[in-house]
């Protein structure tokens, strides 16, 4: 049964509506996880470290797609809630076209930036060569990956979250199968892992382009449009929190790698990469929920339905709290098998990964609330507060903590830094929620 944005959402309906977005985000995160798993076990530790070292740069660039997707879908959903369907499709079309053209230009520039960025991150010798090789291959599909990030949000706004899920599942399975074929069977090494990801990203980005470009049964369709400078600026402002989250994460991940190189060498970077893979999957649950529920919030905000805003906010906080505790418990239980799966071939690296993940996992108790808080304000078209939460969470607090805490606790200080930064951010998020309760009437 099709669920519409205008409906009243029970727990069952809310979970049914956001579930495809959660799975979409999980499969998106699997791209890099599967690459890392095969590279670590079939190519070697140095190539594995190279993937982890250059990935923050690539993810930071692709974050522009998340910015346009989340910021633009909030505007489009609000416009639909106001009953302006034709105008909503104009905005949607403009944003997709800008992403496609901009993505091609950015991909070409990124080809030349991979080498200096890898050097900046501390790569040299064989590690540098692997970073350049893998990074330039992934630049090929950068426009498609940016479009995929845009369409993840717009599939939900179009009331087609299940179609979006199917696209991402097909893309993810393609990546996994080709990783196995290229790396494990044909022994193409690091290039094989890179091209497997490229193929998956092309499917995830181009299929939605064809779907929305033709006559379809959704609320949205690509067509003729005009340049709306104010809407583009509002999209960038509104989605700046998501851009800040991804860009800052890339900067912070690079800083973590530098600190780990200092305290644990190449093993530290490899251990951090393994931990990040699980972090991507766990946190993607919260990001998926935020993406899936945001258009509902935007729609009812546009329709001035305060009772439904309260209903959505209260249910969301309870769901996130339940997932937070569950993920923390799961993380503690899987620390040993996780380390065995990725780095069981090296006892020292195994111990470093296992102990590091158990300390890192305390962040899962908190980060879901901060992710939702930022996305909630984006959905309410308050890009400033959303961006401020993301800026403090992903850049200011994390940089400060990861630079200072290791001076006191050594390598354990690196693993604990994220949880401390999330706790500091939660204080800020909670303050904004209380201060703005009378403005948006969600409490």
Language-model segments: which ranges?
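Short runs within selected transmembrane alpha-helices of multi-pass transporters and secretion channels
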Residues: 69, 137-156, 167-175, 193-206, ...
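Transmembrane helical elements of multi-pass membrane transporters/channels
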Residues: 16-35, 137, 171, 200-204, ...
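Short alpha-helical transmembrane segments in multi-pass integral membrane proteins
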Residues: 1-18, 76-143, 185-240, 297-363, ...
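Transmembrane alpha-helix boundary and packing residues in multipass membrane permease domains
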Residues: 21, 25, 37, 41, ...
């Amino acid at each position: 049964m099709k669920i519409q944005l205008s409906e009243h959402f029970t727990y069952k309906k809310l979970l049914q509506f956001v579930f495809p977005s959660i799975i979409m985000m999980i499969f998106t995160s699997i791209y890099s996880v599967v690459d890392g798993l095969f590279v670590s076990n079939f190519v070697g530790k140095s190539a594995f470290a190279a993937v982890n070292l250059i990935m923050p740069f690539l993810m930071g660039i692709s974050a522009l797609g998340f910015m346009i997707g989340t910021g633009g879908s909030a505007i489009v959903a609000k416009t639909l809630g106001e009953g302006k369907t034709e105008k909503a499709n104009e905005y949607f079309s403009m944003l997709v076209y800008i992403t496609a053209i901009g993505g091609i230009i950015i991909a070409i520039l990124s080809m030349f930036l991979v080498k200096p960025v890898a050097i900046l991150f501390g790569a040299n010798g064989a590690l540098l060569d692997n970073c350049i090789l893998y990074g330039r291959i992934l630049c090929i599909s950068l426009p498609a990956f940016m479009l995929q990030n845009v369409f993840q949000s717009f599939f939900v706004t179009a009331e087609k979250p299940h179609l979006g899920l199917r696209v991402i599942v097909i893309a993810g399975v393609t990546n996994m199968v080709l990783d196995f074929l290229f790396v494990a069977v044909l022994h193409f090494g690091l290039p094989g892992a890179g091209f497997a990801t490229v193929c998956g990203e092309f499917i995830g980005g181009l299929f939605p382009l064809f779907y929305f470009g033709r006559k379809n049964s959704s609320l949205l369709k690509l067509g003729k449009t005009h340049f709306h400078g104010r809407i583009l600026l509002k999209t960038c402002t509104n989605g700046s929190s998501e851009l800040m989250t991804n860009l800052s994460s890339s900067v912070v991940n690079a800083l973590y790698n530098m600190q780990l190189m200092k305290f644990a060498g190449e093993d530290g970077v490899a251990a951090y990469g393994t931990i990040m893979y699980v972090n991507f999957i766990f946190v993607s649950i919260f990001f998926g929920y935020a993406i899936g529920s945001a258009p509902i919030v935007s729609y009812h905000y546009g329709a001035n339905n305060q009772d439904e805003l309260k209903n959505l906010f209260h249910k969301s906080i309870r769901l996130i709290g339940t997932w937070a505790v569950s993920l923390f418990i799961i993380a503690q239980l899987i620390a040993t098998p996780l380390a065995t799966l990725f780095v069981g071939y090296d006892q020292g690296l195994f111990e470093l990964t296992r102990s590091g993940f158990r300390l890192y996992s305390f962040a899962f108790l908190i980060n879901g609330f901060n992710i939702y808080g930022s996305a909630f304000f984006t959905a309410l078209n308050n890009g400033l507060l959303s961006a401020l939460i993301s800026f403090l969470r992903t850049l200011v607090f994390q940089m400060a903590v990861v630079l200072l805490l290791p001076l006191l606790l050594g390598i354990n200080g690196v693993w604990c830094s994220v949880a401390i930064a999330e706790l500091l951010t939660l204080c800020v998020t909670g303050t904004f929620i209380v201060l703005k309760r009378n403005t948006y009437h969600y409490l």
